[in-house]
Design a protein with these regions (language model features):
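Glycine-rich, aromatic-flanked loop segments that form ligand/cofactor-binding clefts
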Residues: 13-18, 56-68, 96-146, 183-186, ...
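Active-site-adjacent "subsite" loops/lids of carbohydrate-active enzymes
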Residues: 14, 22-42, 113, 118-176, ...
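Catalytic domains of carbohydrate-active enzymes, especially glycoside hydrolases
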Residues: 42-68, 176-181, 276, 280-282, ...
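Aromatic-lined carbohydrate-binding/catalytic grooves of carbohydrate-active enzymes
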Residues: 54-91
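Aromatic- and acidic-residue-enriched segments that line the glycan-binding/catalytic groove
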Residues: 69-84, 119-147, 186-209, 254-264
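Aromatic-lined carbohydrate-recognition surfaces of secreted/lumenal glycan-active proteins
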Residues: 105, 110-123, 183-187, 215-266, ...
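Extracellular glycoside hydrolase catalytic/binding regions
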Residues: 211-212, 217-224, 237-306, 328-343
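Substrate-binding cleft of secreted/luminal carbohydrate-active enzymes
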Residues: 271-297, 312-391
């Protein structure tokens, strides 16, 4: 157990404290496909109770990992990660999303619905794909991209109809469910595969409008983020919109505004201009994934937390932390690695919380980190920080 005065002095402050609960490939929940409704519910409640006991006040729950649904939808089929077969409803029937929101709220925690905007088929060789899956109904919206080990099918971000469809999916969720937030992770255009360009030449030819291809790709992502920001607020102006990007926007060598890092970047490789979205106020919070250790040679945690602190433009910035890396190398065998990273989120200006990848990392209390949270850092429960620019939820204090 690591004790620090920062834990104690921070006790009374509002802070966002959350875990990502991943459903893709059954990473966190359900533990395997085809569990009974009762087993699924029991597992989810056990996860929630663990996170609550650790002091979390929110969960970021993946409800649409691959153009599929953990809720009844007229737009996309039931997820294979629930039942083992895409399109098959849970039996006995229940609405997992409704159940999860209710259980989360019962414990005084926020529920952020996490979606992958563009991933449609996780693995084209072995994923279950239902007849009513969008990739079967509208094949012209999709492209395949990957390497010898795995090919994934994606919505083509350059096709306007694909953007509109994803917007309809989000609108439907916000309209029908009492979510506190809508959350995207780092997958916009996919991470580049060596020697292979993303196959969007036809869409570029049709919709490129004379822009350079990189610029056009960025404009496609900008356009959907702006559209979603508006759509969410039209439906429920109190619902938060957050994005958890890869931890580096740009390197200093490419842009004087960039960080002193030597890494892949959001802007140049994933075509995601996070800073623009923050500056424009299209999103309410950002969770940069700072999954490197303090002192990392190419992407130092300290360098990056300071950089993001200076580039949040008045929106909330929570730091994505990596308990899954426990014991993966010498730095992550150090029991103080995660506690020191938490301390830095509290001593660095403009940082309002932490989000942990992922839920299952806490099951075995790696390096005693659960104890550190319960007995020190999160000893006192606190509310999530207020966003004064948002409308108040009807009936809230």
């Amino acid at each position: 157990m690591i004790i620090s005065s920062v834990g104690a002095t921070y006790a009374q402050k509002a802070e966002f404290r959350a875990a990502w609960i991943a459903t893709v490939e059954n990473i966190d929940w359900p533990s395997k496909r085809g569990l009974s409704t009762e087993e699924q519910k029991r597992e989810f409640i056990a996860l929630l109770d663990m996170h609550r006991k650790n002091g979390m006040n929110a969960v970021v729950m993946q409800i649409r990992p691959a153009a599929d649904a953990f809720y009844p939808s007229e737009l996309e089929p039931w997820s294979e990660y629930l039942t083992g077969k895409q399109g098959q409803a849970p039996s006995p029937y229940y609405d997992p999303l409704q159940f999860m929101i209710e259980e989360t709220h019962k414990r005084g925690m926020e529920f952020h619905a996490w979606l992958n905007p563009y991933r449609a088929v996780f693995n084209t060789a072995r994923s279950s794909v239902a007849p009513n899956h969008p990739s079967r109904l509208y094949p012209e919206w999709f492209v395949d991209y990957g390497d010898a080990s795995k090919t994934t099918r994606y919505f083509n971000p350059g096709v306007p109809e694909a953007q509109d469809f994803v917007t309809r999916v989000i609108r439907d969720i916000v309209k029908r469910y009492d979510v506190d937030g809508i959350h995207f992770d780092d997958y916009f255009y996919p991470y580049p595969v060596a020697g292979k360009d993303f196959p969007d030449a036809k869409a570029y030819q049709r919709y490129g409008n004379g822009m350079a291809k990189d610029q056009w790709r960025r404009s496609n992502v900008d356009s959907i983020i702006a559209k979603l920001g508006r759509t969410i607020k039209q439906e429920k102006p109190w619902v938060k919109f957050g994005i958890s990007p890869f931890g580096v926007w740009r390197n200093k060598t490419e842009d004087p505004e960039g960080s002193d890092t030597k890494a892949l970047t959001n802007y140049d490789h994933l075509y995601a201009d996070i800073l623009l979205w923050l500056r424009k106020g299209w999103i309410d919070y950002v969770v940069p994934q700072l999954y490197w250790e303090i002192g990392h040679e190419r992407a130092d945690y300290l360098t990056l937390i300071n950089w993001w602190s200076e580039h949040s433009y008045g929106r909330h910035c929570y730091i994505g932390l990596a308990p899954y890396r426990a014991n993966s190398n010498a730095a992550w065998k150090d029991k103080t690695q995660l506690p020191r990273q938490i301390q830095l989120t509290r001593t660095t200006p403009n940082i309002q919380g932490q989000v942990y990848f992922s839920s299952k990392s806490f099951l075995n209390n790696p390096n005693g980190w659960n104890d550190s949270l319960q007995n020190n850092y999160y000893r006192q429960q606190v509310p999530t920080p207020a966003m004064p620019w948002l409308a108040k939820k009807p009936g809230s204090q």
